[in-house]
């Protein structure tokens, strides 16, 4: 164990523990913007600086290991002044229109600036504004990028796709798509990890909420919404509901209040998908088609995009079944239209999904028919759903746990476990 003192508190930590981790483990939250443990420990933002007794210059706490006898100050006048200056410099190259930012209220830079009581930027602003394809499901706003390099490292070290890279030098350093490519030509799987780990609003999903609002306001349209199994486990985080209270039934109630005509749980079409995949597996296995590789699920469009760009030789081993999202859309515009006496073109199908790749999946020409349009007309993420709830002034505490509409409200446990690792395989085995 290593013994040191942080802000007058004597603590003991394991060897090779960084000063930042040592402080956080003992209730001293040193702020940071670029730090991701084991992934991005480059001290680029210099917000995590601390003062080490006996040393004139401040040191970064995220990449300096705690040593025996160290005396550290995380909030001395010298630290506060330097930290404030560093944040002000970052803000001078950041588009500070927070009220129109998707991350407003949950932005790391916004929180740190507020904590440091920064109400004015003393430096001349130099904002890097670049064009971006606004039709692509993943949106990058260069004016908000703070060059923390998180997106680069998460894509390189975790996803192994290296979609992002650094370009330029010195003060002109910025982040862009690797090889100066357009994002639509890059091997991006649309996994959303760069969006999740961006500390500001430089990366976000394309917002499709207005399309859904317009459809709900159109009296000629019958709006049918499906809610993916994974959404029920995460929507409560942004609404303040406890996990046991944030049920799928309350999501359905919220969607009905917004103006949806029918709301279903995607577990119904997940059951359809797994029956198709299980039958296909048995057929291909008995025919000897799976001697070299197993059959891979096609449920996840992010995985399908990844396989096509990185392992094209595995594409023939993907299941030919549509994903639950697309099966749901197809059923709604065929069987369900006949059941309720509507034309396919009068049905507007909406998916509430946890993944940005679902937006790209629904746009594929493979899932388009002249008589009905796309199987799925719009996809919104969990974050977009919560935004719509707030826009409609729906208080989560007032939501009731209601069942899905008939006749697609029934589903097995196999469909529910699609949202966890190994869930699709287990569902196939059950089937």
Predicted regions, residues:
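Iron-sulfur-associated redox domains of electron-transfer enzymes in respiratory
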Residues: 15-75, 79, 206-431
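Charged, low-complexity surface patches
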Residues: 12, 134, 144, 187, ...
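Short strand-loop junctions, especially beta-strand C-caps/beta-turns
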Residues: 7-9, 178-180, 230
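Eukaryote-biased recognition of intrinsically disordered, low-complexity regulatory segments
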Residues: 1-7
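Fe-S ferredoxin-like electron-transfer domains
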Residues: 46-190, 196, 203-218, 222
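Conserved SAM-binding loop
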Residues: 12, 147, 296
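A short N-terminal beta-strand-loop micro-motif at the entrance of redox/enzyme domains
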Residues: 9-15
